[in-house]
Amino acid sequence: MAKAKRKAKATKAKAKRSTKKVGAKSAKHTKGASVAKHTKPRKPQRFTFSHHREEDFDQGLRTYAKYRDLGIAPATGGMVQAHVIRFIPPFRPEEVSTPHYHDVDFQMVYVLKGWIKSEFEGEGAHTFYAGSCWIQPPKIKHTVLGYSDDCELLEIVLPADFETVTLE
């Protein structure tokens, strides 16, 4: 009998952990709620992968950086762009420090190596180091203020095709 009670308790605890309250402000799990299901159709996606090769770094959006496309845009039908950005040393403020924004739905940046310092409208200046991550809201004005000679970033953007607007 005790074994059956323990099993029932464990099952109840597992059910408690695996349900979330829909619309909750935090990721805490709540008893008795269910997770919302995706109902809108999604673009077809296909499996893809990318291995590191130095020769894959090429010119891109910024003249002061080289980009390694990770092949995500074609695999997601243009829904997502992902690339590694390698900044070209040395930092040249006259070329790099131009205020701009990106007309995107989502932009996430993760520092792989080195550091980068940027200023964001309404947020001030921040220095990010290897292991740091940030999200830039759509159209937030920002300026790169500096970066290390070995700076590399992973950038993920939605949609894959977006406009960058330079401000003077």
What are these regions (language model features)?
Residues 3-8, 14-90, 166-168:
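A short, N-terminal "cap"/entry segment at the start of jelly-roll beta-barrel domains
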Residues 62, 75-80, 91-108, 149:
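A short beta-loop-beta micro-motif enriched in histidine and acidic residues
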